[in-house]
UniProtKB/Swiss-Prot annotation:
Gene3D superfamilies xrefs: 3.40.50.2020
Pfam short name (any one): Pribosyltran
Protein family: Belongs to the purine/pyrimidine phosphoribosyltransferase family. XGPT subfamily.
Gene encoding the protein: gpt
Main location: membrane
InterPro entries attached to this UniProt entry: PRibTrfase_dom (IPR000836), PRTase-like (IPR029057), Xanthine_Guanine_PRibTrfase (IPR023747)
Protein name per the record: Xanthine-guanine phosphoribosyltransferase
EC top class named in words: transferase
UniProt binding sites for Mg(2+): 89
Catalytic activity, reaction form: GMP + diphosphate = guanine + 5-phospho-alpha-D-ribose 1-diphosphate; XMP + diphosphate = xanthine + 5-phospho-alpha-D-ribose 1-diphosphate; IMP + diphosphate = hypoxanthine + 5-phospho-alpha-D-ribose 1-diphosphate
Lineage per the UniProt record: Bacteria, Pseudomonadati, Pseudomonadota, Gammaproteobacteria, Vibrionales
Length: 154
């Protein structure tokens, strides 16, 4: 993927607050199930914004940094998902979301970002991303010193 969409910490906070507003009233939710690892930060922000104290994880492995591979369920809460928000940072191909729908047919599945191949599997999301674009999440980046241009030429 040659295109990149960079999400800053500030933008992630803003997107998650917008996503939280769509989940009101908060009292309808028993808890949040954050999909590890991408959904952990959005899940924490949503828990704060909605005043939800019960947060658990669904651990599914399907990526090695930028390469998708076979899916493995490492940890999964019991039940059909009724009353729970399943939170992801991104729905890309839809493979993980499809698996989650099978496992938890009554949960509400939400994500911060969605690509065309997977967005129909979501109940809510806030940012549309082109299918050929790689997302750089704030937890995958660091701020570094950049040499001034005039010093690079010497």
């Amino acid at each position: 993927m040659s295109k990149k969409f960079i999400i800053t910490w500030d933008a992630m906070q803003t997107y998650c607050r917008e996503l939280a507003e769509k989940q009101m009233p908060a009292e309808q939710w028993k808890g949040i199930w954050a999909v590890s690892r991408g959904g952990l930060v959005p899940g924490a922000i949503l828990a704060r914004e909605l005043g939800i104290r019960y947060v658990d994880t669904i651990c599914i492995s399907s990526y090695d940094h930028d390469h998708q591979r076979d899916m493995t369920v490492l940890k999964a809460p019991e039940g059909d998902g009724e009353g729970y928000l399943i939170v992801e940072d991104l729905v890309d191909s839809g493979d993980t979301a499809r698996k989650l729908r099978e496992m938890y047919p009554k949960a509400k599945m939400i994500a911060v970002c969605a690509k065309p191949s997977g967005k129909e599997l979501l109940d809510d999301y806030v940012v549309d991303i082109a299918q050929d674009t790689w997302i750089e999440q704030p937890w995958d980046m660091s701020i570094q010193y950049a040499e001034p241009v005039n010093r690079k030429q010497k």
